[in-house]
Amino acid sequence: RPPRSTLFPYTTLFRSEELRRIRRSQEKAMEGAPHESILVVDGTNGQNALMQVEAFDKAVTLTGLIITKLDGTAKGGVLAAITQMRREKPLPIYFIGVGEQLEDLQPFRALEFANTLVGLDPATPPTEKDD
């Protein structure tokens, strides 16, 4: 059996074609559909998460993301990478998962997340430096 990394492109192509068919069915069934195309990404997947975002966006034109598993060793590097990758066409992150329970799914607040990432109080408002 080939390693998972070599399987990824084939499974992605299959999923992408299936998603395109679903999208076409939705468009035929209701004008303006689908209204949202949200991808849930495992925050521990690193570089694979970036490839998933690119592949799924190409297939169905994503409107947002949910990033899970940001409570362990994944401290948000995938968020920074996705932001860097998508500078010309930003993709909103609606929720982040910081645990195993439904209650651990939180609305994503970029400033709070950035403050926490660098060790500041999440509630600290930004300050302007005197020039």
Regions found by a protein language model. Name each.
Residues F14-G119:
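Conserved catalytic-core segment of NTP-binding enzymes
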Residues N115-D131:
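Non-catalytic terminal/linker segments enriched in charged/polar, low-complexity residues
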Residues R1-T12:
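Single conserved hydrophobic/aromatic residue that forms the stacking wall/gate
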Residues F8, A110, P122-A123:
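General structural signal for secondary-structure boundaries
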